[in-house]
From Swiss-Prot:
Is not activated by Mn(2+), Mg(2+), Ca(2+), Zn(2+) or Co(2+). Its EC number is 1.2.1.10. This is Acetaldehyde dehydrogenase. Activity increases gradually over the pH range 6.5-8.5. The gene is dmpF. It comes from Pseudomonas sp. (strain CF600). The keyword Oxidoreductase applies. Pfam families: AcetDehyd-dimer, Semialdhyde_dh. GO terms for molecular function: acetaldehyde dehydrogenase (acetylating) activity; NAD binding; NADP binding.
């Protein structure tokens, strides 16, 4: 089947532009319909024009006025959390059945991490891609969660300062809140916590993620196997996703429990997972794995939805 569904991308910054290149190069069920920005001089809009994609710098209102809008089935929103709320309202009014893939921390729709819960949300009109830290770490929490009950999970996402554009910087509070919540909702942890670090080092460092999971006592080999299997599943759409070293385990005995603020005393198994995410360097440099994992997860989500719509 050669039929493809048309997509528009709102936001002509780092994420939007990388996503456009991924759609143009890699998509099987989607094709570019329009690229939407608010800065007429942005590199993303200029690049879209050079690649033959229809553009507008009049935001969502401009998109709705384009003749191409009639054929748009999917919209990727790569703006900011506050902008997404307005964009959703305008688009929904203009075309009630349009599908939105939200790459901001707005989270109007359910959280989606493709390897964990995409199949549950194929029919949803708005899904939220959590955050870059969430896409990288929630699969690891879920991997432990399918072996043992997870009481607490804490993630630290370290990204290069250079890869954080104005949208990322404006959304730091939303990043921590959305990621923490999604660790609980999708990862299966009773309590989640997220920390983001922007590293100003030059040359820029690759995205690194540390995941600490406190769970009920469990077979360490089973946890390690579950983590390895999940890493492989993520690599299907983010080839640069990998374990930095072997999974580390610490048994916390009942005689010397840990005190977790808000949860009380804990004994069981502490699992530490160390990840790095290298980008595919389609538009962004390879060190910007944090942005690449977002665009890759968003494309994987929309592709699976489009496939399901075309096969219906």
């Amino acid at each position: 089947m050669n039929q493809k569904l048309k997509v528009a991308i709102i936001g002509s910054g780092n994420i939007g532009t990388d996503l456009m290149i991924k759609v143009l190069r890699n998509a099987k069920y989607l094709e570019m319909g329009a690229m939407v920005g608010i800065d007429a001089a942005s590199d993303g809009l200029a690049r879209a024009q050079r690649m033959g994609v229809t553009t507008t710098y009049a935001g969502v209102e401009g998109l709705i006025k384009l003749p191409e809008f009639a054929d748009i089935d999917f919209v990727f929103d790569a703006t900011s959390a506050s902008a997404h709320v307005q964009n959703e309202a305008l688009l929904r009014q203009a075309k009630p059945g349009i599908r939105l893939i939200d790459l901001t921390p707005a989270a109007i729709g359910p959280y989606c991490v493709p390897v964990v819960n995409l199949e549950e949300h194929l029919g949803k009109l708005n899904v939220n891609m959590v955050t870059c830290g969430g896409q990288a770490t929630i699969p690891m929490v879920a991997a432990v969660s399918r072996v043992a009950k997870v009481h607490y999970a804490e993630i630290v996402a370290s990204i290069s300062s250079k890869s954080a554009g104005p949208g990322t910087r404006a959304n730091i509070d939303e990043f921590t809140e959305t990621t923490s919540k999604a660790i609980e909702v999708i990862g299966g942890a009773a309590k989640g916590k997220a920390i983001i670090i922007m590293n100003p080092a030059e040359p820029p460092l690759i995205m690194r993620d540390t995941v600490y999971v406190l769970s009920a006592a469990a077979d360490q080999a089973a946890v390690a196997a579950s983590v390895a299997e999940m890493v492989q599943a993520v690599q299907a759409y983010v080839p640069g996703y990998r374990l930095k070293q072997q999974v580390q385990f610490d048994v916390i005995p009942e005689s010397a429990p840990l005190n977790i603020p808000g949860l009380g005393r804990f004994s069981g198994l502490k699992t530490s997972v160390f990840l790095e995410v290298e980008g595919a360097a389609h538009y962004l440099p390879a060190y910007a794995g944090n942005l690449d994992i977002m665009t890759s997860a968003a494309l994987a989500t929309a592709e699976r939805m489009a496939q399901s719509m075309l096969n219906a």
